[in-house]
Amino acid sequence: MPESYEKWNSVKTAWNDILRSYETLTAPDSFARHSDLVQQVEELIIHGADETGLTLDSEIQSYYTMKLITQELPALIEGTAVIRGRGNGVLAAGTLTDDIKLELLLEAAQSDKALINLMQSLSRIAELNRSEDGELLQKGEQAAGNIRNYLGVLDQEIIHKQAMSMNPDAFFAQGTDAIASASEVFQLAVTLLEQTLQERI
């Protein structure tokens, strides 16, 4: 898989560049670089799935598990991270500019779409009624609920709040918790997919 290898090297280079310059970066530059890195990782995941044929998998369970790994969960994790960072800055400044409001609304809309797709994938996996999928389904629903609640906080405390009063650290912490719950589902999905693929060997 030479193309995936090249993309992996690009990701490693970008990450090492961030590590070397982290202490000297401004907050906006650091945020932009981390966002670019996440985008590269997402592209690497999808490209690797395409090269191995997993995105065309004929078995429904592994197909929807792969969708969780390559599409829905990365989109939710990245979207929540953007909302967490931007929202934290807005609450700290006490001002919501039109540009940032538009960015937050777009991220929220994309997250809503990813949540719908996530629940559809979990629903299809649940239809198979496999005992080994139980934890994934439970944690997946919890993560979806956490992110949905976070989007609600964004709407109530930032987008439609005239006088913002929420503690920025509290908003950031809730976002971190939502990301952690989605990351846990990601790891469970990866483990489940590995087990499924091993069963075919």
Predicted ranges, named:
Residues 1-201:
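Hydrophobic alpha-helical segments
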